Swiss-Prot record:
Record's protein name: PTS system glucose-specific EIIA component
Cofactor section: Zn(2+)
GO terms for biological process, alphabetical: phosphoenolpyruvate-dependent sugar phosphotransferase system
Species in which this protein is naturally found: Halalkalibacterium halodurans (strain ATCC BAA-125 / DSM 18197 / FERM 7344 / JCM 9153 / C-125) (Bacillus halodurans)
InterPro entries membership: Dup_hybrid_motif, PTS_EIIA_1_perm, PTS_EIIA_component
Amino acid sequence: MFKKLFGLDKKAKNEAASPQEELIYAPLNGTLVDIEDVPDPTFAQKMMGDGFAIDPRDGHVVAPVAGEIVQVFPTKHAVGIKTPGGAELLIHIGLETVNMKGEGFTAHVKEGDKVNVGDALVDFDLELVKEKAESTVTPVVVTNIDQLAVFEKQAATETKAGETSLVTIKVQG
């Protein structure tokens, strides 16, 4: 399941485009949360990679980058995207949402789809997630952070989906 998302698929690795600087935009409307403040050690301690999180105001998740969908989890609570420059992002909607087994989540993409910034990825029932999950805070991490030459966070507090630029990245050449 994690083979393509974490760069273990040799075919996908060899097809990576030449490195370029790219922007990661907010995938949700909400309040920016520092990754270290996410109430889950897997994300707060950057075990999955570095990034940011958003406390969402609504249940509409859009693509934070242009790229290819490399993973849509069966429970629809997480999506993996690979950018043309080779960065691999994981958007994990809420915390402990895997236990909801897809209830309240509607995916608008599938593996192999090409997306642009702002394209709909997943809609979810925010009230149901508040009720059934540990938290609505949604981490967005670059899972191949060790392959980046540039990772610069921009200052922001409130985010607008598909519009607020949050991170500049560039994969090493």
